[in-house]
Amino acid sequence: MSFAFDLIPIGLEYIAAYIEDTVEDVHIVDMELEHRTFQDLINVYSPDLVGISLSATEHNESLRLAKIAKKNGVTTVIGGYHPTSVPDLMLSSPQVDMVVRGEGELTMRELVEKGTPKDVLGASYRKDGKIVHNMDRPRIENLDTLPFPTRRLRQYPYKSQDRTTDCDVIVMSRGCNGLCSFCCEPSMSHGCLRCRSPENVMKEILEMAEYHEGRPLSVIFADPNFMGNPNRVDRLSDLLMEHDLNIEFCALVRADAMARNPEIVKKMCRAGITKFEMGIESPNSKDLKSTKKGITTRVHGEAVQNIRENGGRAGGTFVIGLPDQTAEEIKTFPTYAKEIGLTAAAFGIATPFPGTEFYRELDKQGLIFETNWNNFDEMHSVYRTQHLSKEKIEEMATYCMAKFWNIDTLIEQEKVSQQRTGRKKALVDFIRERTSNVSFLTSNGNELQKDNFGQHIKTFLEAYADPRVEAYTRKVKVQEVLEITRFLRILGPQKIQCLLNLDDTTISFVFKTTNKTVEYIRVTQGRQKDSTINLDVDLKWLSEPDHSNLVERLIFLFSHNLSTKKLWNTFKLSVAIGTELLAWNLQKTRPQKTKPPQNSVPQSPLQKSAN
């Protein structure tokens, strides 16, 4: 079973592949997608053993499921980063029979073959009321000896947010030679990086493409440090360019590796590895030093430049709420992300996971106040800092997301994609994708911050007003990035105001258009008086999924367009939107042209900065 929120449970698929010839039957259940109850699953499969893979966030839920399994007489085995770090804690719960520490393939095979954990390396268990830790199992040095993950056991369609693209995961290496104090990987791999051969990885990629029957595919290289061995990445890129695959790859990389290897970055982008997520962490050198990141801020910009010059998309993650950070420092993070040219960014709250140096330091000082493992999710503050309260840190995470994910960033994303594809984005596709993104962020934000969701929305709105959006859209012509020629011709000169409101907090998006151009987009607080079309949205709707009052909401949406002129302008907007929808649907029903090879060279360099 797996609780992986954003990744396919490939670790369990590796284990299943390694043990399936020794057991009568094996099933993989992804609890993020499973709609049946756990008791129903027990009844259907009648398992002898249930293995649960988890992180710290799933600690409580895993114990709940293990308890159900034990009530049905099923042996329970727990594994993953979290159990590896706290095996005694896991075994203190009677519903846990065994813990697999470290890599699971060989240990699980021995457990099912022997039927006992005695003398099985990497296993922890109870004997006569005492916890026994067998010796650690040596790491698997030759990863090519492992069978490929058992994708055929999947019970669920893994799709992109807009449901148009298949998704998959692959791993080229295990471990990381980094020593970041907040990361779980050093405790698992002890700075040791092991790689599969590029030929072995390429063979799996071809099998994976066949499994998805040639459909468009988005694949994440889930390696903690994909560029840990640049020569192997270089060779894999050569192999990928020998095939015309309908696959776009994303990789997790270190900024210093991307800065040092511009030629390999160029080759990766030509080969279809076009999306990159880097641990930027902070624009402040003191934060990079205190977390033992092992890089300087100088490489941030160099890495992004190398990616963008080759048509790639550069994303970065930041850590906020470190022990000595101030609110003023954190407020600079989203600005810095835009300045160095990131087109995607996430701002996670510093979380001390067991097994990390970060956890040991804070635990020693008695600073960790949170006892509910559910909140160890990088969305909640769980320890005391020098300058900021728990509530303030969580608000700052919302502030950073709002400041970065503004309209200028969304347009910049399309500008980068256009650089690679040579095509403008259709307006309907742009709106559909952004609506999907907003819905995803809202639903998950509502779930994770449900006790204070209203305040977070207000913080989001207050942070969203930004004069840089207008400056950006005056400089970067929207009509050159989005295909809106027909839309603007029908709409004509307008000043459209879309006002978002929550209680007394309002923010306005103002779109100034002519027959041929979008002159600017302005994001500002309060209602603007000189608009030609008004659209009002009450954000309380976000927390009210019931659509029974849809007519009432539509009336409210257009309630500030009562004059004859504004009604006419609103009609023109409706016709323009309807025309775009009709054209989009007609386009979708036409036979699609053959997709150009992934290894086509980008047309021209991108600007280094989003602003």
Q: Predicted segment positions?
A:
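Radical SAM enzyme core and accessory elements
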Residues: 1, 380-476, 590-611
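Flexible glycine/acidic-rich beta-alpha junction loops that bind and position SAM and/or redox cofactors
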Residues: 1-2, 178, 225, 231, ...
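Glycine- and acidic-residue-enriched helix-capping/strand-helix junction motifs
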Residues: 2-12
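Glycine-rich beta-alpha loop elements in corrinoid/cobalamin-binding modules
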Residues: 11, 18-140, 355
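Structural recognition of alpha->loop->beta junctions
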Residues: 89-107, 265-275, 332-347
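N-terminal [4Fe-4S]-dependent radical SAM core
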Residues: 117-120, 126-172
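Radical SAM [4Fe-4S] cluster-binding motif and immediate context
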Residues: 148-315, 322, 328, 332-335
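Feature captures hydrophobic
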Residues: 449-611
